[in-house]
């Protein structure tokens, strides 16, 4: 459905898309640090894993939402979850389904952009307080499609996507933001003013973050890193290892810049 929508926007006929073929292709391509999709289900017996894969594949074929697929695997509260495939926590199953689906969707999107003639992709992270530091720094990154090209998911529960673009990465339109760590549904309606809105589609996470208030910045970075950001002149990308995409610890940062830490009393 997602790929067909992109073709529709481009005024082109979409080819038939099979969940079976997509899953096979996605399973051959590593995700998030070299893992294969089979490794998304740690500790699950082989027979059960195959059933989970079937439910995901069938759910995608039938246009089911993440929640509908999760319900089929986890079961329903009315049945005391006895009608689900697995007896695991909701968060664990949720992470597995979302990561697997993101990997399959990412593979489909990339094929779609290539079919539409794009030679570059642009990473688009989510502008909110739940986005990982690594994805925030990847936001707006432009890559040429081909050898060495990276695609999401970059970690479990990764929400970053990619869009086709030209070499300059410029796109039209707006992108949404939520200046809060809570999902929109968890923010009371009387607290949403100023927290939810839209910005130009070419605004990066770093640019957007710089425009947020102190409380949001401090909560996302933590008090010590916030001080380094505001008073020490640290750009956001200095807090993240460019190779692994993982945040540096304060101990690691201090080891290479003890002078700034001393000046700020950290």
Pin down the residues of each PLM region:
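N-terminal leader/targeting and assembly helices and adjacent pre-domain segments
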Residues: 1-79, 173-266
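Acidic, glycine-rich two-metal-ion catalytic cores of nucleic acid-processing enzymes
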Residues: 82-179
